[in-house]
Amino acid sequence: MAEAVWSTDTGEAVYRSRDPVRNLRLRVHLQRITSSNFLHYQPAAQMGKDLIDLATFKPPQAASGHRPDEEEEEEVIIGWQEKLFSQFEVDLYQNESACQSPLDHQYRQEVLKLENSGGRKNRRIFTYTDSDRYTDLEEYCQKITTSAGEAPSFLVERMANVRRRRQDRRGVEGSKLKSRIITWEPSEDFIRNSHAINTPLQTMYIMADLGPYGKLGYKIHEHVLCVLKVDSNGVITVKPDFTGIKGPYRIETEGEKQEHTSAWKYTIDNVSSLAQPEEEEREQRVFKDLYGRHKEYLSSLVGTDFEMIAPGALRLFVNGEVVSARGYEHDNLYVHFFVELPATNWSSPSFQQLSGVTQTCVTRSLGMDKVAYFSFPFTFEAFFLHEDESDESLPEWPVLYCKVLSLDFWQRYRVEGYGAVVLPVTPGSHTLTASTWRPMELGLVAELRRFFIGGSLELEDPSYVRIPGTFKGERLSRFGFRTETTGTVTFRLHCLQQSRAFMESNSLRKQMRSVLDRLEGFSQQSSTHNVLEAFRRARRRMQEARESLPQDLVSPTGTLA
């Protein structure tokens, strides 16, 4: 007797498909392993004439019209989420009092139709769809007690069917539920455990009733043949994998009596209909046209040519953020900010908004200070064009002004401070802190007025924090102007600079340290290059003249006669 080769690899396999999952078809073949099955493995040459053909002995037909050999071997083709009823479900749903949900009543109607049409075609193989309340307890459930006879309750079965993000949930942040929504200093374990993707899954179980002949319809004899899981991304998980060229899978059941113990083998094959060549060509054309249109759409957004600016010009693009304000006297702070461009050589597009106002923010205590976190983003761009080449002064740079205000219960505001920072000259990420101050009046009455009814001294021109752009004199005097130092405002700026001067690759350009040096030297590039070239030619002529002289005149040891 030859030995059958069983497949022991029951692990899951993962497939990806762009086709609709409703086209999936599986062929499941189930057969009981008996001594007569192994006769097929023996060569025909070994079969003598004296041997009796076992196939001539036909088992008797049962009263139900089915012979035992029909229940020992079965083959069905199952589609995705196709419902095949078991004998237990047929007996259950024939009783109307056992139907509790609308799905149970629907199954009852289907069972009655099957009975009227001659009964179900399947005998042992059946399915549980995603809508059924079935859970593979061996895969999901964890026993609560150490008892070997523990049976899961209805609630345990239902809860085990719920997909949890983290089954091992250790370390609850905070003393009670939702006590800390934001973790300011997350640990590496917290980040790793929290970074989970919850993708919805649809599950289908292909089952088999492996009970002895004449005793079908008992839950204890139900066994899982295959588990199918499909998510919204087209990922199909099959456990165990399709049989293919491997041997069949094997299941052994144990019963109270020796005749109830049996072994079964089954195979799972993918018999989904393949697409016709015409359909594949049409699908490829559709995808090619779709990708082409998407590429044209992206090209229309980006443009065909890289946007260049005029020679000698600089484009400054700033992605900024008002991060926080700290050290102020009152609560409910907000910041009014604007960017001032120098009057000469600087400009900005007409659609650009160079000012903004943050939201009102409540402060929180951080050490000895109160901090208001705004995280307010803003963006702008400006252009610098060095037109006057005769002007040897360094170009001015844009300035970011800010005005911090507070709001009280009666919606009255008071000025908390003025500040300003010069935008960074070099590109990259920068964090700047603006120290602020506010004008003040002498006397207790002014402070009481500011505290109770709001209002305080304000600057008519906020640029007075630095040197105003309208000032034309040589010296700016602030003598007698009383101020009080207040808190600080933190800005985070990401600066991008674009200029044709960055394309210069000669040694002179590499030695320049900032964009100001580049722009200042851009208009003098040709003259500098001419001077260096004339110096090289003069040095070359001097070397040629030196080589043409006699060696005794060139040698330092030569003497006159």
Swiss-Prot record:
The keyword Cytoplasm applies. One of its GO terms (cellular component) is MKS complex. Residues 314-442 form the C2 B9-type domain. InterPro entries: C2_B9-type_dom. The keyword Oxidoreductase does not apply. GO terms for biological process: branching morphogenesis of an epithelial tube; cardiac septum morphogenesis; cilium assembly; common bile duct development; determination of left/right symmetry; embryonic brain development; embryonic digit morphogenesis; embryonic skeletal system development. It holds the Pfam family B9-C2. Keywords: Cell projection, Cilium, Cilium biogenesis/degradation, Cytoplasm, Cytoskeleton. It is found in: Cytoplasm, Cytoskeleton, Cilium basal body; Cytoplasm, Cytoskeleton, Microtubule organizing center, Centrosome. Part of the tectonic-like complex (also named B9 complex). Interacts with TMEM107. Interacts with TCTN3, AHI1, TCTN1, TCTN2, CC2D2A. Interacts with FLNA. Interacts with TMEM67. Interacts with B9D1 and B9D2. Component of the tectonic-like complex, a complex localized at the transition zone of primary cilia and acting as a barrier that prevents diffusion of transmembrane proteins between the cilia and plasma membranes. Involved in centrosome migration to the apical cell surface during early ciliogenesis. Required for ciliary structure and function, including a role in regulating length and appropriate number through modulating centrosome duplication. Required for cell branching morphology. This is Tectonic-like complex member MKS1. It comes from Rattus norvegicus (Rat).
